[in-house]
Amino acid sequence: ERINSMAYLPNLIFFFLLAAAVGLFTRNFNRISRNIKLGKDVDRNDRPKLRMKYMLRVAFGQSKMVSRPIAGALHLLVYVGFILINIELLEIIVDGLTGAHRIFAPLLGSSLYNFLIASFEVLALLVLVTVVIFWSRRNVMKIKRFWKPEMRGWPKKDADFILYFEVVLMVLFLSMNATDSLLQQANIESYTKAGSFPISQYLLPLFADFSVETRMC
């Protein structure tokens, strides 16, 4: 019984970490919402289509496509890649809470699932390359508009923090797939053989000497 109860320990740890993350997100969301509500109400119900069109252009970087097409395209790549890769986050959460492994694989079928995982890996690599370009433009090339007075201090730190977290997330995603691939090759029980790993396969030598227990952690 003790062994069986210990088997659920990783799921419990994952649950508490997830709950803490959700709690932190909720607190920050409420704080931002409270600050926004300090402003005065303004009737902005006129021209809804035009307002929505403008908001989407600004939000997804399309307004930069005209004045700075390369920067605009790179911004759009990061947005789309980040959103699509976070679809995989749903599976990670379900697996973490239930103790399952790649639970969406049998639901989607091997062909579609393998295609999606491979696509996510390619997107992760493209996001990494794009983030490095963005960081270099801000900190190495020192483009003039990034060094204006209003862009210094917290705005610069905030942008750099976002880029750093993007790198961490993409590296963790690819590392997870690399170790998962090794565990699948080792025929570890309960590890479903699913997924195609065109990018993370090149990370396998980094984890080849790790023990099975270390890879599973």
Predicted regions and their residues:
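Membrane-embedded alpha-helical bundles of multi-pass integral membrane proteins
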Residues: R2-C217
